[in-house]
């Protein structure tokens, strides 16, 4: 159940344990931090990186959260966008002569916070 509160001006969307290196996700996040919602959508749709699609879905989720709380997503901007490292999955890769090497598969947590410009003034 969602209760509507008119004093709330920011909404958050969080994606955890994304199978992606935090460094590769930060490369995309640094391009959208502080930009408006519509400008962010245009940037992410044209980016060739794999992380852009995951972050685009997360921005859509944050906009849906804003809509559920009665905020206008067209007048919002990305006030906070961060990528934190998650757990590292350790796998074994078979090698020659019966040996094996450890493969590290990193994960990350991505947080997007949308803030409303009109209620922020």
From Swiss-Prot:
It is found in: Plastid, Chloroplast. One of its GO terms (molecular function) is structural constituent of ribosome. One of its GO terms (biological process) is translation. Transmembrane segments: none annotated. One of its GO terms (cellular component) is chloroplast. Keywords: Chloroplast, Plastid, Ribonucleoprotein, Ribosomal protein, RNA-binding, rRNA-binding. Pfam families: Ribosomal_L22. This protein binds specifically to 23S rRNA. Part of the 50S ribosomal subunit. PANTHER family: CHLOROPLAST 50S RIBOSOMAL PROTEIN L22-RELATED, LARGE RIBOSOMAL SUBUNIT PROTEIN UL22M. Belongs to the universal ribosomal protein uL22 family. This is Large ribosomal subunit protein uL22c. It comes from Lemna minor. The gene is rpl22.
